[in-house]
Amino acid sequence: MQIEDNTFFDPSRKEVSHEQYRFSVEYRIEAGFTQHEQRARDLSYQGMFLNGVRVGATFTFNLPLHFGLQTGLLYTLVYGTNEQHWRSMDAPSVQTEYITHRVLEHDFTVPVRLYYTIPVWKKLNLFVFTGPQLQIGLAENDYMQLHLSEGTQNWLQGQGIPTSPYDRMSDELVRANIQWGVGGGIEWDRYRLQGGYDFGLNNLVKHPLVKGQYMSEWGWFASFSYRF
């Protein structure tokens, strides 16, 4: 004797499925390491790596089919050094002099990420994400040290190149850095470990000193977040 199985048409079963993908909002705090890379096309700007931390809060709109849309506000503090070499204007032979740049950068970041979650086992999930983000520069202070002869320093000043500590974002660089990011990570219950890479999309040079002067800022990060 066969017994008809009506569980497929059980309204309570449909309700469980509905609950699994119901719309909700998650709130998280996040902290981690980040590295920014300033990429330049000419010698008037030197490429530089800046290392530091980023902290902030995000909220995610959980959508059906394991998708989610995340945004929030993150604060970043990074620091880096490099040397910019110049031919001496005083030495009789070909000799280089240099400026040591010690740069401290502060910024806010507003990400807009599309997430996709892959359930693995119980509360263990993997996830990937992509989307744009807006990095808003607050300050980029260059605490430079000069190793220049008087003639070289005077020549640089005549070309409009700074030779004293200053904020690069006061008049030199654009504050809005538009990036596109990709990344992923692992999630257990309320905890996430994630990483990603952000590609700089726009030229940050506000007033080019030479034709075609271009600098963009890319970066990667690894962070930990906790869901309330």
Residue map of PLM features:
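Short glycine/proline- and aromatic-enriched beta-strand/turn motifs that initiate or cap beta-hairpins
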Residues: M1-T58
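Extended hydrophobic secondary-structure segments that form protein cores and membrane-embedded regions
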Residues: E26-R28, G72-L74, V128-G131
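Extracellular/periplasm-exposed beta-strand and loop segments of Gram-negative cell-envelope proteins
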Residues: T34-F49, V78-D107, G137-Q179, N203-M215, ...
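Membrane-embedded beta-strand positions in outer-membrane beta-barrel channels/transporters
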Residues: G52-G56, T109-R113, G181, F221-S223
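N-terminal hydrophobic signal/anchor transmembrane helix of membrane proteins
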Residues: V53-T81
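Short secondary-structure capping micro-motifs at structural edges
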Residues: A57, E97-H101, V112-I118
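Outer-membrane beta-barrel "beta-signal"
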Residues: I186, S216-F228
